Every structure is written in structure tokens, then in C-alpha cells.
Amino acid sequence: MKKQLFLLTLLTGTFALHAQNKTITVSNSLKIDREFETVELTKKALGLDANAKLENYAIKDKSNNTFVETQTVDNDGDGTTDVLLFQPKVKASSKQDFEVFVGTNPNASKVISCYSRFVPERTDDYAWENNKVAFRTYGPVAQKMVEDKIPGGTLTSGMDAWLKRVDYPIINKWYEKMTSGKGTYHKDTGEGLDNFHVGDSRGIGGIAVNVDGKYYFSKNFISWKTITTGPIRTSFILTYADWDAKGNKITESKLISLDYGSYLSRFETTLTGAKTISVGLTLHEKKGTIGTNLKNGWLSYWEPIDDSEIGLGLVAPKNTLASFDNHVTNETDLSNLYGNIPLKNNKAIYYTGFGWKKGSPFQNKQEWETYLTSFAEKINNPLIVKVKK
């Protein structure tokens, strides 16, 4: 009798385990191969029990029975994982099957390629990176130092670029080099450098509100919250003090994420007090060339930078980039190429980033803008995911 009960228990457990296994089909409707695009799987989409833990699941490519890199994220910070991330490779106009099952990937990456953190040891930056690009922006201590006329501060809500040319993480290494006095990240010793000037400009993706032809913007962020870091995505939230745009009280916060393989960060900005935001790309010394394509939803600026060149870019989802303004002025750092995006339910979604000639495959303006066109096409035609019942 005991043997029968044991066998029944074993069989029941086996059936329950297999019931948790899911096959998903990822379809690519475009005539181009797709990779470095992140698919998000929820328990609901997978048909899993509410008590299931996504961190206990792994994914295999069924065509070759190999494990696929995954990452789980608790988006709302309630202690329960909300999504299981992975980046499938799917050929042009084709489908690919993957198995989601309870298990562990023995080949899981130990490198946190998509990384971000608050940096109190360098005043109070917030910095983020992936295997292609790195960025930072500035906090309240840096602002107060400027206001108190203390050297070393920075007053801006613009987004700074760190021009890396290696695929491994550099944020901690560069800050340690700078704060220890052993070196500087303003000089390229083989990994790249920070020679990108922001000042009062919007840098790469800072926003403004236009009232009667004048642009207004916030000061430095006042609070931050890291949501996730890992092999596929880093994401975090920045909040700003209320600010004034010619009598209009503006509230602003940003959910920013950067995925593996992308040259562009994703921004979801929440803002009240205006109907449209203007997302800026700095024009620096106005020695570069702008590119605009409202139909495909992107703006670009290709310019010289020291002994190289760089492309800056803004991409917005279909029919959301309403217009642009090539705003040129003699005021220091205030010349920006602005993309105007109307808010929907107080939110706007857009992507901004860069491609440095020394640290990317983009060697000229045309190659950079081809990337922006392709990026726009992909976000407007996302991979289609179906769970087989």
C-alpha cells in the first residue's frame, strides 16, 4: 500500500511539474533578423498559478535545446517577481519556439551587463550602462554646491553620455579611478572616456516645456529608486522637485530602462502641468548635422567630438513625435534639437541614446540614421508572443 501511495505521489508530482512547463512561440513579422529585443513574460500570460515563482523558471530554445539567458524583475517592489525577461533570436519573417520550465540555467551569466546605481562618492550622480553605452545624470548635492558657489557641483537635468568602447561594465571602475586619485575618466586609456559636455543643455534626452516660445526645465533629480540590474535590463526611477514654466506648476518623474544590446535608453516620463514635452538633443557648438524623420519617428544629430564623431538620437513610438524644433541660440549650452511629444494620460514614452564612432559600428551619419530607422521599425512592430495551451 505504501509503495502504491509513493508511486501515486510521484506520478502526481511529475504531472504537476509538466503542467507548469509552457511552450511559447515568438513570431517576427519583419523581413529582418531580430535580436537584442526583450520579451516580458508574466505569470498570467504563461497561465501559471498565482503562487508560482518566476525566478524558479528557465527557458530553452527548442530548435537546439540550449538555455537562453533570463532575468526576473520585481517592478513594483512588493517582493514578488512580476516579469521573466529574455531576448530571443528570430530570423526574418519566421517563428521560433521556446520552452519555459521549472529549472536552472547552468550557464547563466554572472556578469551584470545592465547596471545602474546612485553614486554618493562622486557627489551624487546616478549612472547606468549596458554592454554598448553608459550615461549619468545629477542629484541634489551637486545642485546645492553650484547654488552655494562650491567648486565641483553640477546644475542640470540634462543626460550625460559616457563614451565606453568595451563590452564589460565600467561605471564602478571609472568612479573608483577618479575618486581614488589614481586616474581620470576624462582621458581615454583604452576603455573610453567622458568628454561629452552637458552644462545647461538637455544632453541626450533631457526634457523641457515650451511656453510662448521659451523653454523651461527642471533642476537636478531629488530622489532615486533602483528597480533592477542584471544580464538583460537595468531600470530605475528619478523624481524631480516641482518646477515652474511661466506660471505653470510642473511635476516630473522618469522611469528609465536600458536593455542589453541597445544604444538607446527607454524613458517613460510622467508629467503634469503641460500638454506636451520637448525632448532635447544638445547641439553643442553647432558644428554637426541634424537629421529628422517624423514619419519614422526619429531625430538625430551627428557631430564631431574631439578626434572622433558621435551620433545622438531620439526615437518615439509611431505617431507620437508630433514635430521638432531646431532651436539655435547664442546663449551658452541652450541650443538643442527638440522633439515635441504630446502627453497621453500625463505620460510620454521615448528612447534616446548615442553611437560613438570609436565605440560602435556607426562610422557616419547615414549608418547611425539607418540604426534609428531600424530601431523605430522594431518598436512599432514588436515580436509577437503566443503561449501554446
Task: Describe the residue ranges of each PLM region.
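Bacterial Sec-dependent N-terminal signal peptides
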Residues: 1-23
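Alpha-mannosidase-like glycoside hydrolase catalytic domains involved in N-glycan trimming
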Residues: 20-116, 123
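Polysaccharide-binding surfaces and accessory modules of carbohydrate-active proteins
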Residues: 21, 278-327
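Short, well-ordered beta-strand segments enriched in hydrophobic/aromatic residues
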Residues: 24-28, 132, 254, 265-271
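Beta-strand-rich recognition/accessory modules
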Residues: 82-90, 316-389
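Solvent-exposed N-terminal domain segments of exported/luminal and surface proteins
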Residues: 104-214
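Extended, loop-rich substrate-binding clefts of extracytoplasmic carbohydrate-active enzymes
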Residues: 179-259
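Acidic (Asp/Glu-rich), glycine- and aromatic
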Residues: 252, 263-292
